[in-house]
């Protein structure tokens, strides 16, 4: 192994220009590939506070259609009442929560001073079971916090500091949209990249939203996250929801519910943009596949030319090795191992560049119609940047680039006869 590394650095010193171009070419390819991987991890992997993405199903759209007049359509989002009637009774559901998208609100001290614009969300006590928040002080909202003479809320650390200069704000009273509210919890700031959990202030929606008074009660401006005990329970939950919807529709007179092939998994949920059109996942996967293929192929073809140039300079050396009994497969393996050292150097440089690229472009990469204009920060999770999966994939892509760029030139070089190799000028 050490001999291979020494040989690789000898080649690097002998051909500094070609070696530098090869390393930078590999780095460029790895930068683009790993930027895609890190973006995918940030959007879809289990990351704090959305640590249960792989165990969650989602409802973010609802269609009500006339039973007799099929031209009568209402596309919207589901309600807390829909969650109560059609999801909570299913035994495979560990927890489920309904929540609004974080929207602009105004907070200030109780006397009206120190006004701030924040992103506020209405949710329920189950929210804190589905999502994992880091509490710096206080506790989560519970059923006991509903009602009473004053609204209870949880705020993030940055809002607490701006209002009070400290995160020790438990029991303090503030005005939230001119309504006197009491702070019972302070949590670590949530990144805007957490599509569902992000907000700066969390409160409870009114219990009236759980009541059913007509078909319109199933529409309510909420997104619903359903936490399964294991992903293996997804089919049972889907079947359970479909059965409950069928039972509800049987009791409705004018309209009927259509959940449009929901619930979605995390990938479908993030890409479910329109209420009346579901995500096209095959096209999404095809686009990612084509992008990765092109990013791998084009640099590899260019690097293949550089490797071929290096092979032409080493033909005599390869001839001598063959004359002393080295087989073609042995030479190919040695060449690939030597080239892999340079590829790994380029891969390491590319991985660092990918971190910088994602950080610099994070707002552009993660901005969507839901979070545009939010007050929070698009901070990146260290778990997404430094997860074992990222390093494993970076190494795998380095192996692929190494095989594509050095494999063919090495095979062609070892195909030459000993006499031709030794007489090469």
Range-by-range predicted roles:
Residues 4, 387-425:
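C-terminal membrane-exit region of the final transmembrane helix in multipass inner-membrane proteins
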Residues 124-140, 151-278:
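Mid-to-C-terminal secondary-structure elements
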Residues 15-16, 230-231, 406, 417:
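Short loop-to-helix capping motifs
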Residues 37-163, 167, 176-181, 363, ...:
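Structured, solvent-exposed hinge/loop segments at the ends of secondary-structure elements
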Residues 11, 15-44, 347:
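Short, strongly hydrophobic transmembrane alpha-helices
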Residues 37, 290-318, 331, 404, ...:
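A hydrophobic alpha-helix feature that marks transmembrane segments and, especially
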Residues 2-3, 10, 14, 247-291, ...:
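Membrane-helix entry/capping segments
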Residues 17-21, 25-28, 316-362, 393, ...:
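Transmembrane alpha-helical interface segments in multi-pass membrane proteins
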């Amino acid at each position: 192994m050490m001999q291979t590394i020494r040989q690789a650095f000898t080649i690097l010193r002998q051909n500094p220009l070609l070696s530098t171009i090869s390393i930078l070419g590999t780095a460029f390819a790895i930068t683009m590939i790993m930027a895609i991987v890190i973006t995918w991890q940030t959007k879809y992997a289990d990351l704090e506070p959305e640590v249960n993405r792989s165990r969650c199903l989602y409802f973010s759209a609802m269609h009500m259609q006339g039973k007799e007049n099929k031209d009568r359509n209402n596309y919207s989002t589901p309600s807390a009442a829909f969650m109560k009637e059609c999801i909570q009774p299913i035994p495979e559901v560990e927890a489920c929560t309904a929540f609004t998208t974080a929207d602009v609100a105004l907070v200030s001290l109780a006397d009206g001073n120190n006004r701030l614009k924040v992103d506020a969300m209405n949710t329920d006590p189950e929210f804190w079971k589905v999502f994992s928040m880091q509490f710096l002080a206080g506790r989560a909202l519970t059923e006991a916090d509903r009602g009473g003479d004053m609204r209870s809320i949880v705020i993030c650390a940055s809002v607490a500091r701006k209002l009070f200069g400290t995160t020790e704000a438990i029991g303090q009273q503030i005005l939230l949209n001119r309504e006197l509210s009491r702070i019972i919890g302070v949590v670590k700031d949530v990144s805007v990249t957490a599509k569902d959990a992000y907000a700066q202030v969390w409160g409870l929606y009114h219990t009236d939203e759980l009541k059913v008074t007509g078909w319109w009660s199933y529409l309510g401006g909420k997104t619903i996250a359903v936490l399964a005990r294991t992903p293996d329970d997804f089919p049972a939950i889907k079947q359970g929801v479909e059965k409950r919807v069928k039972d509800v529709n049987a009791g409705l007179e004018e309209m009927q519910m259509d959940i449009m092939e929901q619930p979605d998994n995390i990938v479908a949920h993030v890409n479910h943009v329109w209420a009346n059109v579901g995500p096209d996942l095959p096209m999404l996967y095809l686009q990612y596949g084509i992008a990765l293929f092109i990013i791998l192929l084009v640099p590899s073809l260019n690097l293949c030319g550089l490797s071929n140039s290096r092979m032409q300079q080493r033909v005599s050396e390869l001839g001598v090795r063959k004359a002393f009994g080295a087989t073609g497969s042995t030479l190919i393996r040695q060449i690939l191992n030597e080239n892999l050292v340079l590829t790994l150097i380029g891969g390491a440089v590319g991985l660092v560049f990918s971190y910088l690229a994602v950080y610099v472009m994070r707002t552009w990469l993660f901005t969507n119609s839901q979070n545009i204009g939010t007050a929070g920060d698009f901070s990146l999770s260290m778990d997404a940047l430094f997860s074992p999966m990222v390093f494993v994939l970076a190494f795998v892509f380095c192996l692929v680039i190494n095989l594509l760029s050095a494999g063919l030139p090495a095979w062609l070089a070892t195909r030459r006869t000993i006499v031709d190799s030794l007489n090469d000028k």
